[in-house]
Amino acid sequence: MSGNNIKVVCRFRPQNSLEIREGGTPIIDIDPEGTQLELKGKEFKGNFNFDKVFGMNTAQKDVFDYSIKTIVDDVTAGYNGTVFAYGQTGSGKTFTMMGADIDDEKTKGIIPRIVEQIFDSIMASPSNLEFTVKVSYMEIYMEKVRDLLNPSSENLPIHEDKTKGVYVKGLLEVYVGSTDEVYEVMRRGSNNRVVAYTNMNAESSRSHSIVMFTITQKNVDTGAAKSGKLYLVDLAGSEKVGKTGASGQTLEEAKKINKSLTALGMVINALTDGKSSHVPYRDSKLTRILQESLGGNSRTTLIINCSPSSYNEAETLSTLRFGARAKSIKNKAKVNADLSPAELKALLKKVKSEAVTYQTYIAALEGEVNVWRTGGTVPEGKWVTMDKVSKGDFAGLPPAPGFKSPVSDEGSRPATPVPTLEKDEREEFIKRENELMDQISEKETELTNREKLLESLREEMGYYKEQEQSVTKENQQMTSELSELRLQLQKVSYESKENAITVDSLKEANQDLMAELEELKKNLSEMRQAHKDATDSDKEKRKAEKMAQMMSGFDPSGILNDKERQIRNALSKLDGEQQQTLTVEDLVSLRRELAESKMLVEQHTKTISDLSADKDAMEAKKIELEGRLGALEKEYEELLDKTIAEEEANMQNADVDNLSALKTKLEAQYAEKKEVQQKEIDDLKRELDRKQSGHEKLSAAMTDLRAANDQLQAALSEQPFQAPQDNSDMTEKEKDIERTRKSMAQQLADFEVMKKALMRDLQNRCEKVVELEMSLDETREQYNNVLRASNNKAQQKKMAFLERNLEQLTNVQKQLVEQNASLKKEVALAERKLIARNERIQSLETLLHNAQDKLLNQNKKFEQQLATVRERLEQARSQKSQNSLAALNFSRIAKPLRGNGAAIDNGSDDGSLPTSPTDKRDKRSSWMPGFMNSR
């Protein structure tokens, strides 16, 4: 090292793709000796001197061998050491400290090489030296100290005392026994470190990381101990926001990083300017932790990482100036040694001897002073001096009271014998200690098993607690649902009571209305019966007139009577001339009359067919009239409902008499309608009578015709035969006449039957037609009445108003009586509702009181559960911390190491180091033999 100053090493990395893309070119020139560089920038041109300058293609091993190797040796010898890596973001600090791959011999960084160097130095040390190595890993993120080996420990405090100096309280320190264990610690810690992407670096460190190695050295023979701390600091890079593109959380991190680096620069300025009386270590947690490394008890190496490109000229110049200032810092490094028991005893003996000498000197001086005070004199040769006291020349000194010779004191009691142990006794002590260590290992194994069992029991208890919580939660849900259902049930019961009261009141009102309705129905039926009796006679008369008028149009009695007379004359003629012989002309005339009679019968048959067709037409007309009647009745009902609705709408604010007036008006309209219908029925009856008389006339004509036909047939049968010459012809003619007579008689009989049937059917159809016409006329009259009534609403309203005024005086008393009765009913109803509501209020108050009690109990339970949850949370946190330590596979038990391949248990000859704390706990060598030897 160059004196006791900080060693500053400068390292340049090659240009990256961003710098090449932006047109950057190298602007540095390193001299052949590697201690000076020239910066050829646009803003600044000049030289910088450092302890060593490494170019862009320098290997990791070369940087380590020159810069760091000696510091590791000093730390193992008991000195404190610090290695800084400083530079802008993306300048290669993390690559220098950690490397690309800690398992690659070429690219692994300074920290892996330091780890290997530490254990190599331990292995190369004498066998009587025992070493323990502890590792801790922390980061300073957003000005908060965070333990990377125990991420749950955040914002750790920084303390200071006389023995420890500045330290981080609560920082986890792990004992390690091999490089693999250190690498595992480094991997675990690096995984917890905060990194982020920026435009300058894809994995930019967002915090300062510090790896601290504590190496303790003990001489097992003498008991002397030394300890050294090695700080490996990877600083986060200084950032220019314009280049990194930081924003949001990354921007806040950049602010904190630049703040701590500024505080570091202020500390260096205060240490180097020679004028500052105060060094601002407390301005940043970084400078506070590294207080001993900057101007204190430490041997420090600062590695400044720079970019050679003109693209980052300003950042490179700032970094070089920082390193140049730091180079002038002077540290005061010393060995951190603990005195051995022998050295402490010698020091104690020396101090005791000096104390006795001073006491003797004080006593001699007091004696000389007493002589002078008594007026005596002391010769100059007997004056008290320190040299005489030191030499033990007490004869020439004046006597002093209380003075005792130290020699007599020394001989007054024998010295305590110092026991000396033989080699076999020392081996026995070591063997006993190893046995105790084995027992400790067994106890630790048993403790581990017990902890596992306890953990399983805790998990089981946690499971049961979760089950209990789920059951409790379900119970609470069911309880709440039950409470809600109870409330709903009570609400329903209360509503049912109110509904029952309302139903009772409605029943009473319904009974009153039913009684009134029965009375109205009775009055209406009486009025209908009276009106019906009055209109039945008129309707029958009208119906008879219409039937007579209708049947008169179908009276064929004249024609039938003429033909009947002709047929009867022919038959009479036949009867009168039975004894005479008929001539040919008579027979021809008779046949002609028979043919005419047959034609007349056919004509009447056709007439009957026409009547049948008319009957069918009347049936169709009947159906049509029935449809029209239904439509008119429907329209009448709709119009009536509309009229009633309008009347009710207009009567909302009127008196109750309006309803009576409307009922009276409707009854009058109904009576008028019944009267009109009765008149139409009477007309139809009269028409039916007329048709019946016509039918009787037709039947009489048919009877006459049949009689004439019979007479004619008889006359023909009584006609005598002609001469013998015409006998055959007459016989044939008689047969024809007989057939004709029979045919006419049969036709007359059929005609009579048909006439009767037709007349019955015609009479029935006429009755139906008359009834339909009467109904149609009645409906038309009702429709016209409704139209007239709707057109005269104003007059009807006036009449109703007058009627209401007339009836108002008579109904006042009735209204008052009804109002009084209704008020009494309402009072009773209100009293019942009030009683029900009071019961409801009392039940609700009881439920409220119960709910408050339950709420208090639930609050107490909740507080208890909250306390339990907090306890479990604390247990979980502690368990998490323990799990993180268990994940590292390490323990807090020290792992002593010895050099020259000496086995720690004094029983193995292979110099292998422990690789894991599970490989039979490392036995610590005893310090007792050395203590005994020092005695």
Curated annotation (Swiss-Prot):
PANTHER family: CHROMOSOME-ASSOCIATED KINESIN KIF4A-RELATED. Residues 342-887 form a coiled coil. Keywords: ATP-binding, Coiled coil, Cytoplasm, Cytoskeleton, Microtubule, Motor protein, Nucleotide-binding. Its main location: cytoplasm. It comes from the Eukaryota. Residues 5-329 form the Kinesin motor domain. Belongs to the TRAFAC class myosin-kinesin ATPase superfamily. Kinesin family. Kinesin subfamily. Residues 400-419, 898-935 are annotated as: Disordered. GO terms for cellular component: cytoplasm; microtubule; microtubule associated complex. The lineage of its organism: Eukaryota, Fungi, Fungi incertae sedis, Mucoromycota, Mucoromycotina. It is found in: Cytoplasm, Cytoskeleton. PROSITE patterns: KINESIN_MOTOR_1 (PS00411), KINESIN_MOTOR_2 (PS50067). ATP binds at residues 87-94, 237-244. It comes from Syncephalastrum racemosum. This is Kinesin heavy chain. Composed of three structural domains: a large globular N-terminal domain which is responsible for the motor activity of kinesin (it hydrolyzes ATP and binds microtubule), a central alpha-helical coiled coil domain that mediates the heavy chain dimerization; and a small globular C-terminal domain which interacts with other proteins (such as the kinesin light chains), vesicles and membranous organelles. One of its GO terms (molecular function) is microtubule binding. The keyword ATP-binding applies. Kinesin is a microtubule-associated force-producing protein that may play a role in organelle transport. Its motor activity is directed toward the microtubule's plus end. The speed of this motor is 4-5 times faster than its animal counterparts. InterPro entries: Kinesin-like_fam (IPR027640), Kinesin_motor_CS (IPR019821), Kinesin_motor_dom (IPR001752), Kinesin_motor_dom_sf (IPR036961), P-loop_NTPase (IPR027417). GO terms for biological process: microtubule-based movement; mitotic spindle organization; spindle elongation.
